[in-house]
Structures are given as structure tokens and as C-alpha cells.
């Protein structure tokens, strides 16, 4: 499983493996889990390709795709 951390303030869309130490998909006042809130969201995906496609279809002009440099998820 993959988690995509969409952060509106920075424009980063960072993809993590579920087991990554930086993967912390938790509901907050400003960020949702599998739903958008004011500062973005965490979304779960079954594959790298599905997460990347979601980014391509939903990104804004200033959005940046960035796989995590710690867990290093890659396309198969």
C-alpha cells in the first residue's frame, strides 16, 4: 500500500510506502484522510501507478510530484 501526502501550502505531493517512518496518515483539523481539507490530505493507493495517475489528473499548476527519499517508492 502507498500513501500520498498532498500538502497545499508547499505544493508537494509526496508518495510513501505504508511502512515508511514518515508516513503518518492521520486526520487533523486542516488535513483529511482520503478526503480533502484546507491544507490537503493523505490518500491511499494500491500501486505507484495509481497514485501517479491521480496526481497527473488532479494536480495544480504549482504542484510538485516527489516520491519520498527515505522509503524510495518506485514504479514497477
Walk through the language-model features, giving the residues of each:
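Mature, structured domains enriched in cysteine- and short glycine motifs
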Residues: 1-76
Amino acid at each position: 500500500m502507498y500513501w500520498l501526502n498532498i500538502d497545499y501550502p508547499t505544493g508537494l505531493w509526496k508518495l510513501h510506502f505504508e511502512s515508511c517512518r514518515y508516513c503518518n496518515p492521520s486526520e487533523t483539523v486542516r488535513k483529511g484522510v482520503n478526503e480533502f481539507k484546507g491544507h490537503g490530505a493523505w490518500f491511499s493507493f494500491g500501486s505507484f501507478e495509481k497514485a501517479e495517475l491521480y496526481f497527473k489528473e488532479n494536480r495544480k499548476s504549482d504542484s510538485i510530484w516527489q516520491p519520498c527519499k527515505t522509503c524510495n517508492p518506485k514504479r514497477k
